[in-house]
Amino acid sequence: MLSWDSLSHFFILYYNGFMAKIFIFRHGQTVDNKDHTFSGWRQTDLTPEGIEEAKGIGEKLKNEKVTKAYQSDLIRSKHTLELVLNGFHEGVDLITDTRIKERDYGNLTGLNKDETEKQNPEQYKLWHRSYNVAPPGGESIEMVEKRVLAFLNDVIPNFTKDDVIFISAHGNSIRPMRRYFEHITIDEMCSFEHIPGKIYSYEI
């Protein structure tokens, strides 16, 4: 989903022969992921498997001359980016931005997903994958999209020719990023499952 400001910026860049590359990836598997627990904004670090997934991202991107790298304030995003950059990239402009952090699951945070779904399947479905229904005390995907869109509209105009951007994000913040760049529908955005270790690449 592009705002008019970002569309205008896109056409200016296009006609000036501008080309920047953006690589977006989800953090590696965490302890909460492994245990099927709603993480939200709570801190949960990478498992040994998650560490290997992050190293795998780094191996795939080691030849990219990254100029800026964005992370959220959550340890799983930071740890993943640290492993991606380690040994391959030096002097990178490293930026922490809370707008790309995971969705706040509110009262669901720390609960087991399987048990929560079993107790109330229909309500679970609404909380988990609907666009505009937020769990008690938490965020809807629509609310996450608003802050992620604000982030993208702030940072993209500052990219310069030949910039290479890394974004270490989360499953629910990647959703609106993909909608922004790929022009997908709301239903498609809400239905995607983002696999740890997968890289989404874009050129603007």
Residue ranges and their predicted role:
Residues 19-23:
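Extreme N-terminal starter segment of soluble prokaryotic enzymes
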Residues 12-15:
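Short, positively charged and aromatic/hydrophobic N-terminal segments
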Residues 29-83, 87, 135-149:
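Loop-to-helix element that buttresses phosphate recognition and phosphoryl-transfer chemistry
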Residues 55-125, 181-195, 203:
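Phosphate-coordination/substrate-recognition cap region in phosphate-metabolizing enzymes
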Residues 34-37, 121-135:
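Short, basic/glycine-rich phosphate-binding loops at helix/coil junctions
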Residues 78, 91, 149-204:
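Active-site-adjacent alpha-helix immediately C-terminal to a catalytic or transition-state-stabilizing loop
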